[in-house]
Amino acid sequence: MSLFITFEGGEGCGKSTQSKALYRYLKKLGLGCVLTHEPGGSKSGDKITRLLKWSKEEHISPLTELLLFNASRSILIDNVIKPALQDGKIVICDRYTDSTLAYQGYGRGLDLDTVKCVNSLASGGLVPDLTIWLDMDDKAALLRKGELPPDRFESENNGFHQRVRNGFGAIYATEPDRFLKLDASLPQSEIFSRIKQRVTILLGCRNE
């Protein structure tokens, strides 16, 4: 029984924490499960990630970001996500195409149809069964990052992060049935309880 679950949200919203918790929970249930992330998730993809997040030697335009993110995505899908789904496993991915649309489309201002087209080409049209959106005020979320040095995206101004948040909201509005929207400022235990509830329902439907 294959299932594709993605986590989305702005910087510092707790995606990584919750995706790891869900992975551990499903493994304890004895279910075949793969945890991965974007950008990266593969050796080649991780090299692209370092360029995207930390390069200071050259200017990286929004269009270049779009193409690099999707190059990394294509590698990840071909080598990790599709094989796992074909093997009947549950795949949990920290970020996916919605992030690219929110960041490079709404955040950077690239044409939304162009972003959607490139995303679709790179993903082969693969759409998540469930997308968990952890929504949080961008200023509060960035405070969670602590004293770690910020990458290129974390370093952007508040206006950028607000546009990204608005972008996720716009995506959610067009496909509400695919999403589980959660307030990321809630206690982590409460957030995870709601995630477990939704995933359990989804697993039950798939087993019928």
Curated annotation (Swiss-Prot):
Its EC number is 2.7.4.9. GO terms for biological process: dTDP biosynthetic process; dTTP biosynthetic process; dUDP biosynthetic process. The keyword Repeat does not apply. GO terms for molecular function: ATP binding; dTMP kinase activity. GO terms for cellular component: cytosol. Keywords: ATP-binding, Kinase, Nucleotide biosynthesis, Nucleotide-binding, Transferase. Pfam families: Thymidylate_kin. It catalyses: dTMP + ATP = dTDP + ADP. It comes from the Bacteria. ATP binds at G9, G10, E11, G12, C13, G14, K15, S16. PANTHER family: THYMIDYLATE KINASE, UMP-CMP KINASE 2, MITOCHONDRIAL. Belongs to the thymidylate kinase family. Phosphorylation of dTMP to form dTDP in both de novo and salvage pathways of dTTP synthesis. This is Thymidylate kinase. It comes from Dehalococcoides mccartyi (strain CBDB1).
